[in-house]
Amino acid sequence: KKPDRYRNRPYLLWIAECKGVTVRDIELRNSAMWMQSYIRCERLRIDGIKVFNQSNKNNDLMDIDGCRDVIITRVIGDSDDDGITFKSTTDRISENITVSDCIISSHCNALKFGTETTAGFRNVTVTNCVIRESSVKEALTGNAEGICGIALEIVDGGIMENIAISNIVIDGPRVPFFVRLGN
């Protein structure tokens, strides 16, 4: 069930409680809300997609929420709001996730853990990615060069465990890393 604040705006892809999902070699453009929302999925593969989401506020590139056994690779994306975003809005942790070989541009946070973090994140590897300034110079949310490259935010009491981030190029955002831990 979507939270009330999101009910009147459709996502382009909203996939909930599915197993063995593959999204491959497609191009997605300008959703009314978050481009892709994956909730409580298992064995999710996202490979070789191109995403441009600059038409509205809250135009996240993708949101991975309470999913496990996820591989995200070769994604090229440019979003007005957050880029690749991990959440845990319920008691189910987001875990066993690999992100590699992606190019992400965002007016906000290109790679974000949080802020909706009820359960948290475990066993996440991010490697060989480039974070750069958006191609769109006028931001609806955030700012043209991006707010942050990588944001690690636990604010709802969840855990953040075994997160490995390596071989990342960050060129553009005002702040390369932001960490916020709270309850």
What are these regions (language model features)?
Residues 1-183:
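Extracellular/periplasmic carbohydrate-active domains that bind, remodel
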